[in-house]
């Protein structure tokens, strides 16, 4: 991961922008191209098949994080983020993740603080009930889902107004229900 990030940055800095000739700085995030670009990218060495959705941000491929939230965050923070203009991790947690933890707010504070101290740049955090998201997909007319807002990346959207494909991709990211 670090070697790929460094290589990408070295290639980009060889180019200059059209506004003052400053060296280019790559980004490690995508507003929507992780979904829209899937048909233009073949299979990848991590086991992703051609046509599958790409990983969102600097996260692993949806469903590929097998060791848990903290190892994923440590891996994401291992690249030198000062070389990039952006790179967020998507932390999509189900409420049961906090079962057995005395203070969920202290856990989030401590997790976030450790991530930033280790070099991480940005966290997009959700605590959403997977069952509610799935029900909202099937029953968008229900009053309780009219104001269900989710953070996509650099913007938010009402969940029921998203296309079915985007809803499914978003739900596929809800992979942290426990520490491991």
Where do the language-model regions lie?
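Acidic, glycine-enriched catalytic cores built around paired aspartates
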Residues: 1-180
């Amino acid at each position: 991961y670090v070697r790929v990030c460094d290589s990408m940055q070295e290639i980009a800095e060889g180019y200059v922008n059209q506004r003052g000739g400053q060296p280019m700085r790559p980004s490690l995030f995508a507003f929507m191209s992780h979904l829209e670009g899937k048909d233009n990218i073949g299979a990848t060495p991590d086991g992703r098949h051609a046509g599958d959705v790409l990983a969102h941000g600097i996260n692993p491929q949806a469903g590929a994080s097998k060791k848990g939230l903290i190892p994923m965050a440590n891996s994401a923070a291992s690249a030198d983020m000062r070389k990039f203009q952006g790179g967020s991790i998507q932390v999509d947690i189900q409420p049961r993740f906090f079962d057995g933890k005395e203070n969920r707010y202290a856990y989030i504070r401590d997790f976030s603080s450790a991530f930033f101290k280790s070099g991480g740049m940005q966290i997009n955090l959700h605590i959403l009930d997977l069952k509610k998201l799935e029900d909202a997909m099937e029953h968008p007319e229900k009053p309780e889902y009219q104001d269900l807002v989710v953070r996509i990346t650099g913007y938010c959207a009402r969940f029921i107004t998203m296309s079915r494909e985007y809803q499914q991709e978003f739900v596929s990211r809800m992979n942290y229900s426990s520490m491991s």
